[in-house]
Amino acid sequence: MKLLRVGTAGAERPALLDAEGVLRDLTGIVDDIDGALLADAAALGRVRAAADAGELPALDATGLRIGPPLARIGKVVCIGLNYHDHARETGAEPPAEPVVFFKAADTVVGPNDTVLVPRGSVKTDWEVELAVVIGRTARYVADDEDPLAYVAGYAVAHDVSEREFQIERGGTWDKGKNCETFNPLGPWLVTADEVADPQDLSLKLWVNGELKQDGTTAEQIFSVAEVVRYVSQFMVLYPGDVINTGTPAGVALGAPEPKPFLRAGDVVELEIAGLGRQRQEFKDA
């Protein structure tokens, strides 16, 4: 299923995109798309049954904003330097263990919402990423368990980053990762049963129509399964938590000088095969 939330910011309603591309209203069946729903197999079953039976009313998508596909996100865990080609382009050694950091849940916005270039920024950068959405509480996932059994679904994430704040201003990466609007998510949450292999997904990103990133999750240093298992050894992952699993080569940071960092007026488009497409205009904060 493709689950999404539509409407004005803060007042989104749950919806489903059916196999014919028709937007369907879920408000008569569920209150919202959130961790509680993803953890409730019976509720998800009712959604699927209603969709299969053609019982869901259609919504007019004309002019309708798409919000983040998930409400009340608990935490956004991020994995840095998780693609072989991205590590090569930045001159970094592939890490021996996953590089873990966080983005605040309030950085999450809709897939087509405006992204704000922070005041004083001269090095705002792009990163297309596969987002993993947790559907079951994952705590110390064992070696003999399948970590993907804890995954509810997948989405497109844009891990927007300010490199000067992140790298040059001291401390941890947090300052360059948590600026407002720095995590567009969606358009949909695609349930895990519709993603045959999360290690076989193409990712692309364009800036002002020019292709900048063209990668595949097959290049990940640590697979989705390895990431879920690893992170669960250090923190509990709850339904509705999100893991951004890293970006492939092609970011501005890895480009020759002068590096083409983002400015107000730029337009970024990104997509992951089967998971949908985003488009953001960048404006000054």
Model-assigned labels for residue ranges:
Residues L4, I66-P68, R88-G91, V115-T124, ...:
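A generic local secondary-structure boundary/capping motif
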Residues R5-G10, R48, P57-D60, L64, ...:
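Catalytic-pocket segment enriched in acidic/His residues
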Residues P94-P111, T124-W126, L262-G274:
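Structural signature of FAD isoalloxazine-binding scaffolds in flavoprotein oxidoreductases
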Residues I134, A142-A157:
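RNA pseudouridine synthases
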